[in-house]
Amino acid sequence: MDKINNITKISQVAPEVTWFLRNLGFSNYYIIKIYDLVGDAAIGLTEDNPYWLLEEFPRMGFDKADQVARKLGVSPESHLRLSAAVTYGLRAYAAEGHAFAPLEEFCEKAAGFLDADTSLIKDVIEDMSFSGDVQLTNLEGRQVLYFYGYYRAECTVAGKLAALAEPPGGLAPVAANIDAVIKKAGQSRGIELSPQQTAAVKNSLVSGVSIVTGGPGTGKTTIIDSIISIMEESGLKTAVAAPTGRAAKRIMETSGYPACTVHRLLEYFYDEETGYMIFGKNSENPLDYDTVIIDEASMLDLMLTEALCNAIKPGTRLILVGDADQLPSVGAGSVLADLIDSDYFFTARLTEIHRQSAESLIVTNAHRINRGESPVYGEDFVLVKADKQQDILDKIVDIASKLSMESIQVLTPVKKGTLGSANLNDRLQQAFNPAGEDKAQLEFGSRVFRVGDRVMQIRNDYRLEYRVQRSTPGQFDSRTDGDTGKGVFNGEIGVIKSVDTEMRTVTVLYDDQRWVEYSYVQLDEIEPAYAITVHKSQGSEFPTVIIPMTWFPPALATRSLLYTAVTRGKKQVIIVGNPGYLEKMTANNQSRSLNSGLKERLVGMYGFY
């Protein structure tokens, strides 16, 4: 359901709804959010199934929904409660990047959480599998539990990619003399492709599905440029996209070729009737391109990859470009790593650092870190020593405040604590954008949103409306001034341009010139972004990156996280803290194992399409 109005005050809520929800223990904040979403239907929906709230307001938590259910007389052993808990638990696994949960492990955790017998949990899971909500299956000799959508996505991606890799009708031919065309493509840009790059381009041209992976400075962008040039000369149509707007913008800046997000390539829209995001491009209305190139492919999650595969017609080249050593996608699945590990598709692994990039200590040290070696320091890769966390915090603020807000980004492994993103943002906001009589601001819980603040959208919201206003129409895609639409995505960064204290709204301008107005109850969807977690920085680059270095939990203080953080810097990386912990982080090659069956489906080829 779509929201019925821009409700911002408790006085705007129907009295009977306020009374009903307040008696169930809801604060004014949630009463307003619920009424804003479903209006008078709030009473009936909640009486029928109080756990509906978890789908719309996941941050509410299961305990709160459970309290409401108890007040409404829902039995602790009811199917309604247990099935809601299974759904909630699988969402928790997905939030950690897992496509499935091992059944026995899941049932034990759920039984402990609910204080229920595991047999009850298994009975409910069996019922849910019959209704098509979840999928029970065997994988590598054990029973595992999927949301049905993730199971379908794995099977679809495996089957579709296998079919694309060997299209029965063949690929649209490029110019006859491939070697000469590749050489000419390099010369047109004043460069000579290395043997590694030449092989990558050549194999991408003759393969239905190919992967190009490598660290910074290994020439991935040059390969993309060369492929685009060859396709244009051959009269073939090419689409270039990336999972995030910032990554798409970077392609535009480096190649001059039009690029967009994968969502926009697939023409996503919010369906008012179903309440789901729909892709206009699909198997019935496929993309009309001969070649599709996806950059920053390490950020592709399982569900977006399924939508992409559904929209690519047979005979289209699909080229995935990314850095497999970076952190995996925020969403469920480990798509790029699984595709590479399956050995099913041609994969070019770029290892040579090219001359111009070799002069950058950021590039040099990224590769050193990836090999488990200590970084070396200089003008563009700086170590500022400090031991105590408070000293590290003070030095970060001091360093950052001497630079422009637009040029720096603080990246940290954690959200909480002295050096977590929340506390860093409080201090950096004071440094960059202190309160003033000429700056409107709005308090929201413990946060203050002020005109001029840098903020980030922290969850996908397909209902959120935007309008486009840019000085150069069509700069990043086909949208023009005045266009409107819906959908703002997790990780998008913008700046607050206005605050209306009377209407309690905040207006944010995002990087691609979309303006979004947030009502008061929507402000939990954004947070300050002077400092962000490393996971949230994926797909972005910043002129100067500042990284605190102290003790962090071993599961987070990993080589891949440090590598990802360092590779976000374009001109300078500044590490502030204890070099001893940097050494430990570099040595910690522990990688988070994600539950994914995509590799096994490709190897066994028991997917369907």
Predicted features by range, described:
Residues 1-176:
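Accessory, non-ATPase domains that flank or precede helicase/AAA+ motor cores in DNA-metabolism machines
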Residues 176-195:
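N-terminal pre-Walker A segment at the start of P-loop NTPase domains
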Residues 190-206:
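N-terminal pre-P-loop "Q-motif" helix
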Residues 210-252, 321, 381-388, 398-418, ...:
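Conserved RecA-like ASCE P-loop NTPase motor core of nucleic-acid helicases/translocases
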Residues 226, 230, 234-236, 243-254, ...:
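Conserved helicase motor core of SF1/SF2 NTP-dependent helicases
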Residues 313, 448-453, 489, 537:
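Residue-level recognition of short, solvent-exposed, well-ordered loop/turn junctions
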Residues 324-486, 497, 609:
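Conserved helicase motor core of P-loop NTPases
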Residues 482-486, 490-609:
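C-terminal accessory regions
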